[in-house]
């Protein structure tokens, strides 16, 4: 029986009649063998202590200072500016396997993975070779190509809810399209989202959102008119009764419920065992659609995503990150009768200049092929559980209040007593302490997401040695702070 790993987190992975929900403070441990076909990784060239002696960010500081004169805040996505953790943002020069190298020559074990896409490891040789071949034919066609058919077939065969799929260029685009589609299909205006869940930066979703909005402590965003969010209803994650109340209050008006089946943009927050099944039941009873935002969890928790892992099939699904293998991509798909409303098959308009880009399709195809290999998810399962439990054990040993957990290649931890059920719980975390921990780990050659409110990721390229080094560094830093 698979279980979510971590202190305060333990329950079965499938929702079946014969299983009893488990929720407590006892850690659970995985029992599986690592894959023998992990990607090659760059080896550390110095010990942790040696690295710290030579650690400098002088070149990154100089480059970032110039960047702030050229781009708002010096970055093209807010969390990269390190505002929530403090210190100097690192400027990356190259990546390979489980490692990143900055322009100062510092090397890091990477647990961000480009925010999720790098599940087979950075700059995989097979993917790079395939991209080189595709590039010989051109970088953008603006017309149909066979690669779109291939990736579409792979996605449809993998994801339980998807009978037809539309490729776009980002997770935000996917969520924008699926929202419009849900409203068009149901002829209803309102949607329910959950506090702390992030579905991109489109206006209707910037209400009690997670990700960068949570990181910066913003309740919403200036420039979003009330008219854009008047039909967006919110509820606390894992709160079934709140959703029932919203449907009762807005009878016949709610088009869909959209959620992250595992929250990753308010930190790592898994669903209670009964939560997803209850939301599926409520939406069916009210003729509303259920949308899983699997931009983060798709192909990460299982080859068929969180919906395969938990055994709950939504009506519509959004994807991104992994299906582009590190190139810009997004997708939304679902039941055929719903998807046939999308233009040109139907009247709901959505388009994109670079949608179905041949390079993104190529990277996605070869990434998914690698994920079909034997032992893929067992490897992710094992190393991620060992990483998370190792960090939590180090926290306990050094006297810090910490909680967290993992599912397959996704994990997170909070500097707070657990369990964490929703965004309100997550906000009790000691973010100042997380910042000190983060900066200490960076000096030790470990790169986590620069925010307490972001999940972490492992890859097929991560090795037992990576995990051991990370846990040892964590214990050292936790003693110091």
From Swiss-Prot:
EC class: isomerase
Record carries keyword Cytoplasm: no
Pfam families referenced in this protein's UniProt entry, alphabetically: Aminotran_3
Protein EC: 5.4.3.8
SUPFAM superfamilies referenced in this protein's UniProt entry, alphabetically: PLP-dependent transferases
GO molecular function, one term: transaminase activity
Localization per Swiss-Prot or TrEMBL: Plastid, Chloroplast
Cofactor(s) the protein requires to work: pyridoxal 5'-phosphate
Pathway membership: Porphyrin-containing compound metabolism; protoporphyrin-IX biosynthesis; 5-aminolevulinate from L-glutamyl-tRNA(Glu): step 2/2; Porphyrin-containing compound metabolism; chlorophyll biosynthesis
CDD domains for the chain: OAT_like
Entry-annotated residues carrying N6-(pyridoxal phosphate)lysine: 321
Family, per entry: Belongs to the class-III pyridoxal-phosphate-dependent aminotransferase family. HemL subfamily.
Protein name: Glutamate-1-semialdehyde 2,1-aminomutase, chloroplastic
Lineage: Eukaryota, Viridiplantae, Streptophyta, Embryophyta, Tracheophyta
